[in-house]
């Protein structure tokens, strides 16, 4: 490769990445998932597009995609709160194992019939497209404001279901290559190996990386590089030992993100940029790899297969997988069924048969790509609408304009939150002493126009003021409500109820006020929060609703595992 070729690659790569970034702003305006934008730019630059770039290097695409996935999952793991496992771990694992098997099996049987393949080849197609994609789920769920049970289940499922899909794909490829037509006991051994080694290497590697980061004295800019290189090492080691690198790197990130770690803010900020670059690079490469003209001959059967998987196989697998978990209501189950987003992972798995030289490998690849396109366009574009229809969007609290980590104490993560007060904020005109600031937070600075003011208790807030607040991550919900817009209060009332009650109130007092018909066996001395927990069962989350005794009871606030506020609304009969 000469210097001119190398420079041309730099030029083309820079133009494609810049175009992806600039055109990403159209995603929200057009209601198209941003990943589709990246994919479309890659396809336009490819052989059948305006760019005419001939790219069919499957090993290179496999390399780029796996590297990108490792970075995306490391970042996703760091941003997943361990507290979400309280409500979602076991349901997500059920979907990540039994759910994938059911989806792959049902989809594979129909694929064999539609494309006139034998059963094993059909099941291989089912295995390739059987898992949801972490990159797509993390990207499309971000900022949707879903209740914690649903969002955590979908995120943990997408981060942990790839081992099952990889295991099924690799096993079926080996069977086809060896001419086998039935399953053997090695099927179970490979499954245990994928999950077991992925978990062990991910947790051990994450623990060692955490220890190394906290022990080393480095320049601040080197900590993120150490973290990402360590995560890729964990991914590569698990994969080399025939474990799940995807699960390992996700668990590594989860451990780093939920333990005290040096320069946490700097690591997260760097990871944010790396994750975006990884998504852009991965979908550009996959778009270049695809020739849209190859999809036309299979369009009708591939569309039928996509609809079968989306409308039947995925919902059935979700309803079966969530049968033991009564905390999920019907609306949540239906929504989880709909968010079976496919993305880069099925396309990467479809490269496996190409590299193994299997017959019909091109067909497997094109079908997988077609299913991914249908999933992103159909499910991805309707995600917000489906969430609203299912009434799973919890009224958001105001997020700061920006947040900056203060690397003062590794065990006590202080941050600076920046809030800008527009005219619709209810606190405009209030004095600082009137604000009920969360305990332990401080207003460090107040900017008015170009001037830095010295805030005192008598300082009145005005439109356009910029507040710099020192606090910690757990203070964000209270600060968000403090600086929220007035319309959000009305939204809270519509969603949570006509009245919001303190959960520490005695049930006996509440029953007298609202005329509740309590059964004799109910302890009237318990608190409202304890009684609501009894009504819901399982692990409640903010936004959970239940109708009882002519009233709708909604969990409005929680502190750790404890219900702190409950919304009450009178049930009205709809004509």
UniProtKB/Swiss-Prot annotation:
Its main location: membrane. It holds the Pfam family Na_H_Exchanger. Keywords: Antiport, Cell inner membrane, Cell membrane, Ion transport, Membrane, Potassium, Potassium transport, Transmembrane, Transmembrane helix, Transport. It is a multi-pass membrane protein. It catalyses: K(+)(in) + H(+)(out) = K(+)(out) + H(+)(in). NCBIfam families: PRK05326.1-1, PRK05326.1-2, PRK05326.1-3. This is K(+)/H(+) antiporter NhaP2. It comes from Yersinia pseudotuberculosis serotype O:1b (strain IP 31758).
